[in-house]
């Protein structure tokens, strides 16, 4: 009787890109082509920046299509100033017409999305791709991670850094699977803000304990050399109305400082 021996299964080995310097990254909100011109002012007004991530790519349909605002002039100017460009891709702009589950659960749409992103990265000489998928849920989470694996392979083959944005770890978002992200991605970025947000209860945007917890919880699953923590350069001023309703206004650091002085508020 012939004995058939099953081949031993071996986990794939994912190599990673790791920078030999501290990454000082800023996201740059770009809503149209004209907004790309702001990069001249952004770099002129910023010190110590190593990396910028413009919001350039938007999931546009359920078949892996993307909308792009990429600019060669933008990339060239950043490179001339020693700043890397990691193009951000998100699922927010067209959230009413796209479905993450449909995009990520089909091999054909995942492959098309990967191909589209890699093509844009090569065409515009991008240094990296930054994933900002904020509407993943338990149903789409496994398919999303499969997409992340497939994208990471193509990024690695083309020398493109892959970073992934994540909420501060909490029970309601554990399905993002940071452990697997920490294996296949080059960097895992904690969005260490929005502890309290517009429409919610008043409170800090990013209290010390909240930020600390986000970092510590992420480090339980992701190698420390891959973790980047993002801090807000804004705060919120909360106003409670007579009827008990609450509203808030986001303010940048300079404006918030002026507001405190104008209202003679003592900080502690």
For each predicted feature, which ranges?
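Mature extracellular/periplasmic domains of secretome proteins
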Residues: 40-46, 175-184, 220
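Short alpha-helical segments and helix-capping/turn motifs at coil-helix boundaries
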Residues: 10-11, 35-39, 70-72, 175, ...
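Short acidic/polar active-site loop segments enriched in Thr and Asp
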Residues: 50, 127, 225
């Amino acid at each position: 009787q012939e004995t058939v021996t099953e081949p031993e299964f071996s986990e794939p080995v994912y190599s990673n890109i790791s920078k030999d310097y501290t990454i000082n990254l800023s996201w740059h909100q770009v809503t149209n082509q004209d907004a790309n011109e702001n990069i001249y002012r952004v770099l002129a007004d910023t010190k110590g920046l190593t990396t910028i991530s413009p919001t350039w790519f938007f999931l546009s349909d359920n078949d892996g299509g993307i909308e792009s605002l990429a600019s060669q002039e933008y990339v060239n100017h950043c490179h001339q100033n020693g700043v890397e460009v990691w193009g951000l891709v998100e699922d927010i702009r067209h959230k009413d017409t796209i479905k993450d589950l449909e995009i990520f659960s089909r091999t054909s749409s995942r492959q098309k999305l990967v191909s589209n992103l890699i093509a844009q990265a090569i065409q515009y000489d991008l240094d990296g791709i930054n994933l900002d998928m904020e509407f993943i849920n338990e149903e789409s989470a496994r398919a999303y991670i499969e997409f992340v694996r497939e994208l990471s392979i193509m990024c690695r083959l083309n020398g493109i850094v892959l970073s992934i944005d994540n909420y501060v770890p909490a029970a309601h978002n554990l399905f993002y699977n940071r452990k697997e992200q920490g294996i296949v991605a080059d960097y895992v970025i904690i969005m260490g803000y929005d502890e309290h947000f517009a429409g919610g209860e008043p409170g800090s945007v990013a209290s010390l304990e909240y930020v600390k917890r986000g970092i510590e919880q992420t480090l339980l699953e992701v190698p420390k050399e891959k973790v980047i923590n993002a801090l807000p350069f804004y705060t919120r001023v909360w106003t409670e109305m007579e009827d008990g309703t609450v509203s808030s206004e986001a303010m940048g650091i300079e404006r918030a400082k002026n507001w405190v002085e104008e209202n003679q508020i003592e900080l502690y």
